[in-house]
C-alpha cells in the first residue's frame, strides 16, 4: 500500500495466496476477496492477484463473509502500519481515506459500486 506524506492512499498492490484445501469446492472466497479489496477507502490505483493453493488439508468453502474478513484484515492492518510509519492517529488515517458522500455513487477500481453510505459519520461513532 502506498501513501503520500499526508497519509492519503495512492495505490494498493495485493498478492493473496489462499489455502483451498485438498481440492477446490468453491471459488467464492477467492473471487469475493478480489472484488472486496479496498473499500470503504478511496484507492486511486489497485493491482490485486488472488490465487488458491492446494494443500493436504480439508477443502474450504464459503460460510459467512466469503472473502471479506480476509481482505478486511489485510487492508486494516496495512492502515495501522501506515499510520504508525507516518505518525498519524489510526482513526485519522482512515478518515482521510474514506469514500466521501460527495463521491457517491462510487465505483471501486475493481468494479463494485457503492450507492450510499456515511462512512466518515460511522467512524466518528466508534473509538479506535
PLM regions and their residue ranges:
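Gly/Pro-rich active-site capping loops and adjacent beta-alpha segments
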Residues: 1-71
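Conserved small/polar residues in nucleotide/adenosyl-binding loops
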Residues: 126-128
Amino acid at each position: 500500500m502506498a501513501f503520500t506524506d499526508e497519509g492519503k492512499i495512492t495505490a494498493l498492490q495485493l498478492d493473496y495466496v489462499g489455502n483451498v484445501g485438498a481440492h477446490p469446492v468453491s471459488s467464492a472466497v477467492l473471487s469475493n476477496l478480489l472484488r472486496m479489496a479496498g473499500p470503504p477507502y478511496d484507492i486511486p490505483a489497485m493491482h490485486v492477484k488472488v490465487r488458491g493453493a492446494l494443500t493436504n488439508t480439508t477443502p474450504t468453502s464459503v460460510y459467512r463473509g466469503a472473502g471479506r474478513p480476509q481482505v478486511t484484515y489485510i487492508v486494516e492492518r496495512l492502515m495501522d502500519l501506515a499510520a504508525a510509519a507516518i505518525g498519524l492517529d489510526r482513526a485519522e488515517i482512515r478518515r482521510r481515506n474514506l469514500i466521501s458522500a460527495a463521491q457517491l455513487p462510487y465505483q471501486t477500481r475493481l468494479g463494485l459500486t457503492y450507492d450510499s453510505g456515511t462512512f466518515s459519520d460511522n467512524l466518528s461513532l466508534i473509538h479506535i
